[in-house]
Amino acid sequence: MELLLLSNSTLPGKAWLEHALPLVAEQLHGRRSAVFLPFAGVTQTWDDYTAKTAAVLAPLGVSVTGIHSVADPVAAIADAEVVIVGGGNTFQLLKESRERGLLAPIVAAVKRGALYIGWSAGANLACPTIRTTNDMPIVDPQGFDALGLFPLQINPHFTNALPEGHKGETREQRIRELLVVAPELTVIGLPEGNWIQVSKGQATLGGPNTTYVFNAGEEAVPLEAGHRF
């Protein structure tokens, strides 16, 4: 399988998805036809989100079609060479994808050779479940099971920073709480600017920041770019 799972879409001082474009180009391998799932977009229309994504990827020769705009989305996914899943609200993304019957077709397409690209919520959707999302508002997606294309849980936008005087939990504390109730999970705290590329059965970590892996009852393990899972 070919996956590109990004923690986020925008870095300080860079345009939207600018840091991801070289990675996308590297993994395209001649693929040009893409479908885009805009369902995580809550404060922007799905048409606008699709147009924005299409404009960014056009210089790479990728043609993007919004899956919400086609008469037969299952057939469109089956025919696509690239499946792109945008960030935003993970609950809304999973709810819409499940209700439209798109989860199994996406898995089948990627297993047949389509490239999967997802950032933030789109990276969450590639995991076994969405239980490591950070998102609000919460809508009911009728279950948290997701695509399961990547075997570990990703926590996008990972940071342990807290504003001075803030008394809420750190991100690590929240992940630790999850591992108490679900000790079978392994969670990757993926900071902004980092990504995971899967190619030819090998998953490789990229990006400038330290990533952390969390397992129940164990110390967090720091990982740097180039680590292979």
Curated annotation (Swiss-Prot):
Active-site residues, as the UniProt record annotates them: S120 (charge relay system), D135 (charge relay system), H157 (charge relay system)
Primary site of residence: cytoplasm
EC annotation from Swiss-Prot or TrEMBL: 3.4.13.21
Hydrolase listed as a keyword: yes
Domain of life according to the entry: Bacteria
Catalytic function, reaction form: Dipeptidase E catalyzes the hydrolysis of dipeptides Asp-|-Xaa. It does not act on peptides with N-terminal Glu, Asn or Gln, nor does it cleave isoaspartyl peptides
One Pfam family matching this protein: Peptidase_S51
GO CC terms: cytoplasm
Claim: DNA repair is one of the keywords in the record: no
Keywords: Cytoplasm, Dipeptidase, Hydrolase, Protease, Serine protease
GO molecular function: dipeptidase activity; serine-type peptidase activity
GO BP terms: proteolysis
Listed InterPro entries: Class_I_gatase-like, Peptidase_S51, Peptidase_S51_dipeptidase-E
Function: Hydrolyzes dipeptides containing N-terminal aspartate residues. May play a role in allowing the cell to use peptide aspartate to spare carbon otherwise required for the synthesis of the aspartate family of amino acids.
PANTHER family reported in the protein's UniProt record: ALPHA-ASPARTYL DIPEPTIDASE (PTHR20842:SF0), PROTEASE S51 ALPHA-ASPARTYL DIPEPTIDASE (PTHR20842)
Family designation: Belongs to the peptidase S51 family.
The protein's name: Peptidase E
Organism: Citrobacter koseri (strain ATCC BAA-895 / CDC 4225-83 / SGSC4696)
